[in-house]
Structures are given as structure tokens and as C-alpha cells.
């Protein structure tokens, strides 16, 4: 990868859920951790570079579940590391609610 390119992880959240800041942070952390574990298997050199350069992340929002699933589908089709978080339902939202998509690093 050229030195000017930065590896980035993108976290895409659902705006319609109106999660508390803490819940949203936890869901993003789940997505990030799963993406790192996947990247460790699929591209450990890029993951190492990503971590050494500060593990840059960008958080974006989509309006609803349909949009979240579209983002996830496109990331998978593009061959990117990605993970769709499904909540366990212990706190704010029902079990099985899909909350965040993590994409990258890449």
C-alpha cells in the first residue's frame, strides 16, 4: 500500500434506533472487534499496519435497517472485511436487532 493511503475502519450505525451514547459505543466496539479478528485471519499484514498507524475509524449513519443491510451486502460483495452486529437484547433493544456494520480495515 502506498505510504499516503491510510487504512480505515468504517462503522455504520442505524439512526432510527435512537440508541443511548453508551449503547451505541458498545455496538461500535463489537463491530470493531469482530472486524479486527476477521482481518487478523484474512490479511494480518494490513491489520498490523492499521494498528501501527493509529487504528483510524470513521462512524457514519444510515436511516434504517434496509440501508444498513444494503451497506453490509455491498461490502461483502466487494470482498471487504465486514461484520453485522446483532444485539443480544439485554438492555435497550429487542434481541436480534441489527445495529451496526463494521467495514475494514482496508
Please describe what each predicted stretch is.
Residues 2-42:
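Glycine- and Gly-Pro-enriched alpha-helical subdomains that act as flexible
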Residues 10-12, 53-63, 76-106:
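Short basic, glycine-rich beta-strand/loop surfaces that mediate nucleic-acid
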Residues 15, 43-47, 89:
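Glycine-rich, flexible loop/turn motifs
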Residues 18, 48-51, 94:
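Generic, ordered loop/turn and secondary-structure boundary motif
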Residues 22-24, 71, 95:
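Short, well-ordered secondary-structure micro-motifs
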Residues 26-29, 73-77:
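Short, solvent-exposed amphipathic alpha-helical segments in soluble enzyme
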Residues 29, 34-65:
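Compact, glycine-rich, soluble single-domain proteins
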Residues 66-73:
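Short amphipathic alpha-helices within nucleic acid-binding modules
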